[in-house]
Amino acid sequence: MMIKQYLQVTKPGIIFGNLISVVGGFLLASKGVIDYPLFLATLFGVSLVVASGCVFNNYIDRDIDRIMERTKNRVLVKGLIDPKVSLIYASILGIAGMLLLYVGANPLAMWLAVIGFVIYVGVYSLYMKRKSVYGTLIGSLSGAAPPVIGYCAVTGQFDMGALILLLIFSLWQMPHSYAIAIFRFKDYQAANIPVLPVIKGISVTKNHITLYILAFMVATLMLTLSGYAGYKYLVVAAAVSVWWLGMALRGYKATNDSVWARKLFVFSIIAITSLSVMMSVDFNVPSSAGLLTYVG
């Protein structure tokens, strides 16, 4: 029973979601030549670091998790794991993950994990989430770290491809997170968390969602235009972005914002999964390096 609780506190769903993006970044950089020991070290290393961040987040958020309907049954809220033990557990997971990335991948992969971890736990969870409407923006940087780690584990350098991945996944996080904040509006309001819908209103949030999806659309296309992904990826990226944008625009006429936001949220997961899969398999670019100058 205790094993189940120690697993739950790491938020397995979040770990799995992040692993899909790690695979996308890793295989994009591998170009069909897969180093399997490196692949496994990267997957397990990132999994451990993400798990650590989630446990620390659960520890930090115990007070607000009690208030929110969605989180009131979390392991630490119900006292199923001693808070002090959870801190030790989180520390062990984090150190193990970072060591694995350092030894099994490369120092750059480890440092990117450290930066993502510090932003998520230190900047976002401890401060920005509770104090600023810009918390979501800061948190998006840590959410974009896994695919960049996967990519840099292979390349050993932070090039234009890594930067484009950072942009794609950071920009994706914003509409994804704002959608959650809309359909969980009452929870965030009750817990006094200053997310955009609560502070500025849902109408303003819809404008932000639309703008971020437009920016996301441009960023996704850059992966092909800069010579990193193929044209099959480009077609899927364009189709997914246009559909997501259409869903966002329909939000202006929505009679039930909660239902609309939930649909937008669900599609955001489909969208990013589709892109991760396509960049994994469509890494060959026909003849020329791309429509824009290749940097790598």
UniProtKB/Swiss-Prot annotation:
EC number in record: 2.5.1.141
A Pfam match: UbiA
CDD domains, A to Z: PT_UbiA_Cox10
A Gene Ontology term for the protein's cellular component: plasma membrane
Keywords: Cell inner membrane, Cell membrane, Heme biosynthesis, Membrane, Transferase, Transmembrane, Transmembrane helix
Membrane topology: Multi-pass membrane protein
Bilayer-crossing regions: 14-34, 36-56, 75-95, 99-119, 133-153, 163-183, 209-229, 234-254, 265-285
Catalysed transformations (reactions): heme b + (2E,6E)-farnesyl diphosphate + H2O = Fe(II)-heme o + diphosphate
Keyword Heme: no
NCBIfam families documented for this protein: cyoE_ctaB, PRK04375.1-1
Function: Converts heme B (protoheme IX) to heme O by substitution of the vinyl group on carbon 2 of heme B porphyrin ring with a hydroxyethyl farnesyl side group.
Note, other: Carbon 2 of the heme B porphyrin ring is defined according to the Fischer nomenclature.
Name this protein carries in UniProt: Protoheme IX farnesyltransferase
Species classification: Bacteria, Pseudomonadati, Pseudomonadota, Gammaproteobacteria, Enterobacterales
Gene: cyoE
